[in-house]
Curated annotation (Swiss-Prot):
Protein name, per record: Small ribosomal subunit protein uS7
Gene name, Swiss-Prot/TrEMBL: rpsG
InterPro entries named in the record: Ribosomal_uS7, Ribosomal_uS7_bac/org-type, Ribosomal_uS7_dom, Ribosomal_uS7_dom_sf
Family designation: Belongs to the universal ribosomal protein uS7 family.
Organism: Thermoanaerobacter sp. (strain X514)
Complexes and interactors: Part of the 30S ribosomal subunit. Contacts proteins S9 and S11.
Gene3D superfamilies on file: Ribosomal protein S7 domain
Pfam family, one: Ribosomal_S7
GO cellular component: small ribosomal subunit
Function noted in UniProt: One of the primary rRNA binding proteins, it binds directly to 16S rRNA where it nucleates assembly of the head domain of the 30S subunit. Is located at the subunit interface close to the decoding center, probably blocks exit of the E-site tRNA.
Highest taxon listed in the record's lineage: Bacteria
Coiled-coil ranges (or none): none
Any GO molecular function: structural constituent of ribosome
């Protein structure tokens, strides 16, 4: 917690090709060691693969995938009298987006073989079709929230 008050959130600039802030955030999540041009190559390459495989606009497929991956509920730990309860809470819109993108990239990296372009494209296509690791992660998160519904009154 900063002593000097609230820290302003940085505005992410839209990417040069699709003019989308969401794509820009995806590029930033894929980026390692500050190598942004490499991350852009990976993302745009993945989008080209998506266009080839689906025959649809890759931005539409990406938006659909994000909507299928973004969680609505999550559990947060809360200590009450020596016991820690998992309290279900709604996820703020900015956090929903960042979690969705984070899970897409995380599960794309976990896929076996091939290049990162192909893995990212495959994960986005799977997520758009409501399958894949990132969608399973969202469903697990929702199941946890549903299972701990009894502790919802501990919200803060």
């Amino acid at each position: 917690m900063p002593r000097k008050g609230h820290v302003e959130r940085r505005e992410v600039l839209p990417d040069p090709v699709y003019n989308s802030k969401k794509v820009s955030k995806l590029i930033n999540k894929v980026m390692w060691d500050g190598k942004k041009s490499l991350a852009q190559k990976i993302c745009y390459g993945a989008f080209d693969i998506i266009r080839e495989k689906t025959g649809r606009d890759p931005l539409e497929v990406f938006e659909e995938a994000l909507n299928n991956v973004m969680p609505v509920l999550e559990v947060r730990p809360r200590r009450v009298g020596g016991a820690t309860y998992q309290v279900p809470m709604e996820v703020r819109p900015e956090r929903r987006l960042s979690l969705g993108i984070r899970w897409l990239v995380e599960y794309a990296r976990q896929r076996s073989g091939k290049s990162m372009m192909e893995k990212l494209a495959a994960e986005i296509i799977d997520a758009a079709n409501n399958t894949g690791g990132s969608v399973k992660k969202k469903e697990d998160t929702h199941k946890m929230a549903e299972a701990n519904k009894a502790f919802a009154h501990y919200r803060w």
